Regions:
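Extracytoplasmic "Venus flytrap"
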Residues: 35-59, 81-88, 110-111, 181-190, ...
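Surface-exposed patches in mature extracellular/periplasmic domains of secreted proteins
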Residues: 73-76, 105-108, 176-180, 314-321
């Protein structure tokens, strides 16, 4: 889905942050005190599965960096708190990291919905901020010290579903109509904005374009409403709990559009793929990294081996392709 962009291991975000710190402080900063890197991370709640997977990769980076002597002759220390997959928890966490823990660097929480509420806090301190898989978070803030690790390029909103539409428009006969459904939260709004752009660029008629509350658990009525439009394509912009709910509802109702999927977070996880099994047959969704020859960047195989060896004991995603 995002094949035109390269994806590097998650540990790269920590390397980039530490490199920025080294550049800013110079050799005079060397001492025995640890370089503290702070952030919030979803360890529970709907994003907890992905968040814990990311955390394991970050711990591996911390251990390896310290084993090699740290940075600037100083050890590194990760300081993180569970944001419970709840945006309202995030501002207090970043305030504590900066004002109480006195961290040297802040990096992003996992996911768009958690990054956005951190931005005003980080901006008020004029800190460099490197986000983790946030879609178009900076489009409203325009903060010059914000960077993000997500392979969606300089125009992120349409890039996220560009691959979906490219595949759809290669069909013969070409589709003519599309339905867009999204959770009413930051990521899904941004992804659906991009889907709208792609649909218009492709000359598709948008026959359904609605959002649903993030607390939704019954997706049957939504699927039936989309089915009634007879849309050729269905773009779903969702986080893990609703991605699962949408897949189950589509299969239970027996709805079969020409193509469905697009921007569904969660379907990349090994446990969710195993849980849904054959119900995922026919869905077209994005991923960031898979173990194919062209994506075997230096260091990836070593990181994957270490991650996968520790994953069972940590109770995280067995493969780690999406978050590690």
């Amino acid at each position: 889905m995002l094949a035109q962009f390269k994806h590097r291991p998650l540990a790269t975000i920590l390397f980039a942050a530490s490199a920025a710190f080294a550049w800013a402080t110079g050799a005079a900063a060397q001492s025995g005190e640890p370089i503290k890197i702070g952030y919030s991370m979803a360890m529970t709640g709907g994003l907890g599965g992905n968040g814990k997977s990311a955390l394991l990769a970050q711990k591996i980076w911390e251990e390896e960096t310290n084993a090699k002597g740290g940075l600037l002759g100083r050890p590194v220390k990760l300081i993180y708190y569970d944001d419970k997959s709840t945006p309202s928890e995030v501002p207090a966490i970043y305030t504590k990291l900066l004002d109480v823990d006195k961290v040297d660097l802040v990096i992003g929480a996992y996911a768009t919905a958690m990054l956005a509420p951190a931005m005003p806090i980080v901006m008020s301190k004029n800190k460099v901020f490197i986000g983790l898989l946030g879609l178009a978070v900076n489009s409203e803030f325009n903060y010059p010290n914000y960077f993000v690790m997500i392979p969606s390029g300089p125009v992120p909103k349409p890039a996220f579903t560009k691959g979906f539409f490219n595949i759809a428009m290669a069909q013969n006969p070409k589709p003519t109509t599309v339905a867009i459904v999204a959770a009413d939260q930051e990521f899904s709004r941004n992804a659906s904005d991009g889907a709208r752009e792609n649909a218009k660029a492709a000359g598709l008629q948008i026959v359904y374009d609605k959002s649903y509350p993030p607390s939704t658990t019954d997706f049957g009525p939504i699927v039936r409403a989309i089915q009634a439009t007879n849309a050729d394509l269905v773009v779903v912009c969702s986080y893990p709990p609703d991605s699962i709910g949408m897949v189950r509802a589509v299969n239970e109702i027996g709805y079969k559009p020409k193509m469905i999927g697009g921007a569904m977070v969660g379907l990349q996880a090994t446990a969710i793929k195993t849980q849904l099994g054959a119900l995922l047959s026919g869905w077209v969704n994005y991923d960031f990294w898979l173990p194919v020859p062209k994506m075997q960047f230096p260091g990836v195989a070593d990181l994957m081996a270490k991650y996968q060896a520790r994953a069972p004991g940590e109770g995280v995603d067995a493969l780690g392709y999406y978050m590690a």
